Amino acid sequence: MSVETSIANGIAEIVLDCPPVNALNSTEWLDLAKNIDHLSHNDEVRVVVISAKGKGFCAGADIKELQEDSTKIADVNDGCWKTARAIHVCNVPVIAACHGFVLGGGILLAGSADLVLATEDSYFGLPEIDRGALGGGAHLSRLFPLQAVRKMMFTGKPISAKRAFEYGSIESLHSDIHSLHQAALDIAEDMASKSPIAMKLAKKALNQIEHGDVDEHYKSEQTFTLELYKSTDSQEARDAFVEKRDANFHAEE
């Protein structure tokens, strides 16, 4: 099972469980979006906590699926956009409890959430530039300052959770996954005790006054992802990643 969902005391927990690195395929992204949307309209749910099992939070999209069928890029983009938007417009607050790696689509989950907590050993990044892809900049910009975002996008290098905490990008740091989970639940319990209508309107108000529309920005960003995906360099990057070798890029007109 790639995603586990449970509801107790007003708190819905979504746990990613897709070994080995919680990289989701196109169907799993679409299912996750539907799951979050369903929870958003469930009167029993007052807050959602997203976490993961395994070595890390989420490594993004399943590159091997795209390698086997390049036409899946449209479905992957659609699923990623719908998932990110479902979190952003969810009627209740969404908390992302991150451990280990938070990469690619993992940035979409964290960057769409209302609150991010992380373990001290976790790190955040968009390695897409080395995978023949783009995307995630809109949500990365909700987490980090401009210079950090551009360096991360252009180099593919991640930022540590400790650096992210210094930026104010995450709410708190925790020594291990157990203390992380407990901290997320403690905050969730506090939120769940508030007036449902007040929380719903508070989130809508915050989304409304936020600079720009992250959902539209991400949709626009995906047009460049598709443009890059059609290039020979994009295919070469994916081939090199799967074959575990250095890529050989060429200038294109």
Residue ranges and their predicted role:
Residues M1-K53, V89:
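Conserved CoA-thioester-binding segment of acyl-CoA-metabolizing enzymes
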Residues M1-N9, D43, G156-K162, H181-Q182, ...:
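C-terminal alpha-helix plus adjacent terminal tail
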Residues E4-S6, H38, E44, S51-A86, ...:
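Glycine- (often His-adjacent) and acidic-residue-rich active-site loop
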Residues I14, L32, I50, D62, ...:
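Terminal peptide-recognition signature
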Residues E28-L32, V76-G79, E221:
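Hydrophobic alpha-helical membrane-association signature
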Residues H88-P196, S231, E236, R245:
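Crotonase-fold acyl-CoA enzyme core
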